[in-house]
From Swiss-Prot:
Protein name: SPbeta prophage-derived uncharacterized protein YomK
Source species taxonomy: Bacteria, Bacillati, Bacillota, Bacilli, Bacillales
Protein localization: Cell membrane
Gene, per the UniProt record: yomK
Keyword terms: Cell membrane, Membrane, Transmembrane, Transmembrane helix
Keyword Nucleus set for record: no
Keyword Cell membrane assigned: yes
Segments crossing the lipid bilayer: 72-92, 104-124
Main subcellular localisation: membrane
GO cellular component, one term: plasma membrane
Membrane topology classification: Multi-pass membrane protein
Length: 148
């Protein structure tokens, strides 16, 4: 149920993960019925300027938290270091694969691919979450500017 009380509570108290889920549910990326959307915007418009400011700041913080560009630099460093560690662990020199280390090289490559795919999936998910937070932030900013 989307009403002013629920909205105020969720914007102030929900943890970021649950708040993103709430926003995605209430404002689906594929759109929704015009009247439903207009009713939800009216409910947001009923918030006070200080509540809007607080929500805007919270959305900016959540957007920043999920922004993959802020963590990808250190993440790539950790990934690269772990891949070198796996090479040592499995005794693999990718440039010199022999009959003796072929199985280890295969295991290394499979683990590396799995880790890269998992990382890519998480980056895409974080980007979607940052975009969701940014969407609501921009809507809140627009509503606040209309009030002034």
């Amino acid at each position: 149920m989307f009403n002013k009380k629920v909205l105020k509570h969720n914007l102030a108290e929900m943890n970021p993960k649950e708040l993103i889920k709430f926003i995605k549910h209430e404002f689906p990326i594929n759109g929704q019925d015009y009247h439903t959307h207009a009713r939800k915007v009216q409910i947001i418009k009923s918030l006070s300027p200080s509540e809007l400011s607080s929500a805007i700041a919270r959305m900016e913080g959540i957007k920043s938290q999920y922004d993959p560009s802020k963590t990808w630099g250190i993440g790539s460093l950790i990934l690269g270091t772990s891949f070198i560690g796996f090479q040592v662990l499995f005794g693999v020199n990718i440039s010199k694969i022999t009959e003796g280390n072929r199985l280890n090289a295969l295991i290394y490559v499979l683990i590396t691919i799995i880790i890269c795919l998992w990382t890519l999936r998480n980056i895409i998910k974080d980007k979607e979450n940052a975009t969701t937070a940014d969407y609501l932030k921009e809507l809140l900013i627009q509503i606040k500017s209309e009030k002034n």
